[in-house]
Amino acid sequence: MTTHNRPARVAEEFRHELSAILARGLKDPRITGFVTVTGSKMSPDLKEATVYVSIHGDERVRKDTFAGLQAAAGFLQREVSRALRLRNTPHLRFVYDESVARGDRIERLLREARTQGQAAPAPDVEPAPGAAPDDEAEE
């Protein structure tokens, strides 16, 4: 049996179990934002687990929730290891995943651009120096 994919399999199981625990909720009052586990990586020796999280809410909610997650890391490590029946408990490290927030921002900017494009006519643009006028370009 090959074991070269084991870290990837354990990382996926780790992500799934951690998501379930977070869905049930933690008692830390700082964790008020909606937390999504977007990915996880496991070191080849299964001693380190890097978990990527996205937190929905304003900047303060994100910071407070992230601090709460880091404070709860030991508890979460034990709970996930117990559920997965791992021999060794991987050290859990959270990393804030900005890709979801970045995607939301891009989507909002595109929506605003479309709204502005419909509201205001496109400005007249003069051709660049040396460019052919439109009627000559069609010939």
Swiss-Prot record:
Q: Which UniProt keywords apply?
A: Cytoplasm, Ribosome biogenesis
According to the record, the signal peptide region is none
Q: Per UniProt, what is one GO molecular function of this protein? A: ribosomal small subunit binding
Subcellular location, principal: cytoplasm
The segments labelled Disordered in the record are 112-139
Q: Where is the composition biased (Low complexity)?
A: 119-132
Q: List the disulfide bonds.
A: none
Q: Organism's domain of life?
A: Bacteria
Gene Ontology biological process: maturation of SSU-rRNA
Provide the Gene Ontology terms for cellular component: cytosol
Subcellular location as annotated: Cytoplasm
Q: NCBIfam families from the xrefs?
A: rbfA
The record describes its quaternary structure and partners as: Monomer. Binds 30S ribosomal subunits, but not 50S ribosomal subunits or 70S ribosomes.
Question: What does the similarity note say?
Answer: Belongs to the RbfA family.
Q: Which PANTHER family match?
A: RIBOSOME-BINDING FACTOR A, CHLOROPLASTIC-RELATED (PTHR33515:SF1)
Functionally, this protein is described as follows: One of several proteins that assist in the late maturation steps of the functional core of the 30S ribosomal subunit. Associates with free 30S ribosomal subunits (but not with 30S subunits that are part of 70S ribosomes or polysomes). Required for efficient processing of 16S rRNA. May interact with the 5'-terminal helix region of 16S rRNA.
What this protein is called in its record is Ribosome-binding factor A
Organism whose genome encodes this protein: Anaeromyxobacter dehalogenans (strain 2CP-1 / ATCC BAA-258)
Phylogenetic classification of the source organism: Bacteria, Pseudomonadati, Myxococcota, Myxococcia, Myxococcales
